[in-house]
Amino acid sequence: MSSKQEPVVLGKIGSSHGIKGWLKITTYTESVEGIFDYSPWLIKEQGEWREVKVTQWRFQGKAVVASLEGVETRDQAQMLTNCEIAVSAEQMQELPEDEFYWRDLIGCEVTNTKGYNMGKVQEIVETGSNDVLLVKANAKDGFGKAERMIPFVTEQFVLEVNLTEKQILVDWDPDF
């Protein structure tokens, strides 16, 4: 790959399906079929990314299965089990203002309106009602917290996101 940006992982290859090289696909996209909006895929084998093309895909019961170019036997398919599926960062859609890819929020410093550094975003948790920032507190947190869970509700709790500076401003009590 010529891009210096890391590929964006959108899913993972599961077990083989049938004898003609089809594979079960686990997708991390919002909709199950969303992963098929991207082409080509990048598959990580033995630490290296390589490009592959999806030739067909379909729902198989509750699962999604796909056929990849050059994978025509069960043995070839089994060699890809548990490989990550990614796309180049350039393929990601431009988002409207005030919408963010989770991957871009990871590692951002979180500060509240009183200037208290709450820590860094470690991950984002989907709760059903709204997403939640899991913020790993600083080692010497003045409130004795190891982590904080801050609802990602813009204008109410999350006041500003500056991806260039990797900063998030929140209206959140550090003792909560």
UniProtKB/Swiss-Prot annotation:
Pfam families: PRC, RimM
GO biological process: ribosomal small subunit biogenesis; rRNA processing
PRC barrel domain location: 96-176
InterPro entries (alphabetical): PRC-brl_dom (IPR027275), PRC_barrel-like_sf (IPR011033), RimM (IPR011961), RimM_N (IPR002676), RimM_N_sf (IPR036976), Transl_B-barrel_sf (IPR009000)
Coiled-coil regions listed in the entry: none
Subunit structure and binding partners: Binds ribosomal protein uS19.
Biological role: An accessory protein needed during the final step in the assembly of 30S ribosomal subunit, possibly for assembly of the head region. Essential for efficient processing of 16S rRNA. May be needed both before and after RbfA during the maturation of 16S rRNA. It has affinity for free ribosomal 30S subunits but not for 70S ribosomes.
Domain comment in the entry: The PRC barrel domain binds ribosomal protein uS19.
Protein name, as recorded: Ribosome maturation factor RimM
